[in-house]
Structure formats: C-alpha cells, structure tokens
Amino acid sequence: MQRRGWFITFEGIDGAGKSSHIEAVAEALRREGRTVTVTREPGGTPLAETLRSLLLNEAMDALTESLVVFAGRRDHLRSVIAPALVRGEVVLCDRFTDATFAYQGAGRGFDRAVLAQLERITQSGLQEGTDAVLHPHLTLWFDLAPDVAAARLEGARAPDRFEAQPVEFFRRVAQGYADRAAADPGRFARLDADQPREAVRAQLMEILHRRGVLDAAQEGG
C-alpha cells in the first residue's frame, strides 16, 4: 500500500534559521525509508529559479512581485510538488504561500484579497478529481523577533532586495505570519527560534513526532 504524501513548509522571516533545519528533517525521514523532495520558494524549477533571481534583485512594485511569485509557484506545483505527493513522497519546502501573504501582503501592504484570488487560481486543479486548493499539510513557523533576526544577518553576506529592508518591514512581515498562524492553527506549528540551534531542533523533532510525520520511536537527534 502506498504511503501518504506529506507537504511540509518551513516559514519565518529572514534570519530565523529555518533553512538550516530542513536537511536534518530530510535525513530523519530518509532513515525511516521515506522518499523526500527538498525544494524552495521562490524557486524549485529552472523557470521558477530564473524568476527568483529577478524577484530578489530587480526593483518592482508589490503587484508585480506577487504575480512573479505566483507564476513561479504554479510551475513549481505542477512540475515538482504535486507529482511528488502523488508518488507518496514527503515534500519539504523552504517557504510557500504563507510567505507571500507575510511579505507582499503584510510587509508591502498589498491587497490580501487579491493574494487570496491568486492563491485559489494558482493552487487549484492540481489534484485528480478535485478543484480544491492545494495547501501544505503542516507549516513549521520559526518565530523570531525581527531585531534579533537582523542582528543574526548583519555582516553575514551581501543582502538581497528583501534582506536589505528596514527592521520595520520585518515587524510587519512577522505580524503577517502571526496572523496566518492564528487563522489556521491546525496547520501551523510555532517554534521559538530565539534559542540555540539544538533546542530548536529538539522542538522541531517533537512536533514531527506528535503530528505523525516521524515515527515516535525514532530519536530526534
């Protein structure tokens, strides 16, 4: 019998540390015999990676940003995410639609009703026999105060167009994530990212065991 596919997203502001934990989760799943696809947004396909480069480096308004993001997302869903789920794989994605509502919606102040329309159009018609919107099964939200995140990023490397935004922008983004989590508490799991990496890793593995993603008998290290 084919195992259930899982679509798990990792969300948080720049500097929250989410990306550093994705490979550890992938390794834990592979030890249990699961096939894992690790991907990211913006990006995940050749077309979407090209759009990512434009998004991070070229000036554009909030509507253009949103259209670019959702164009890449549609290609990513059709080419990578939906087929992997049909095969029963676990998809681990570094950011997804919640980031669009947080960055373009809350951060840029773009109309969230328009984002919701784009979400419905882009993420539907991907599952056989239904026009339902495809959402993650679980979203891991790495919650960190914007001031702390900014201090972590300072001097790390040349910032992209988003990382270079003032801390007030990231306060709005962080609130956008909090609003999304409050609206869908069954899907979101919050992690306190203002802790040492191993403590965050322990939180993460406990959540994955509790949600049934990982075998509860497996060690989380």
Curated annotation (Swiss-Prot):
Cellular component aspect of the GO annotation: cytosol
Reaction(s) this enzyme catalyzes, per UniProt: dTMP + ATP = dTDP + ADP
Binding-site list for ATP: G12, I13, D14, G15, A16, G17, K18, S19
Any single Pfam family the record assigns to this protein: Thymidylate_kin
Cited InterPro entries: P-loop_NTPase, Thymidylate_kin-like_dom, Thymidylate_kinase
EC number: 2.7.4.9
GO molecular function: ATP binding; dTMP kinase activity
PANTHER family found in the cross-reference section: THYMIDYLATE KINASE, UMP-CMP KINASE 2, MITOCHONDRIAL
Name the UniProt record assigns to this protein: Thymidylate kinase
Gene this protein is translated from: tmk
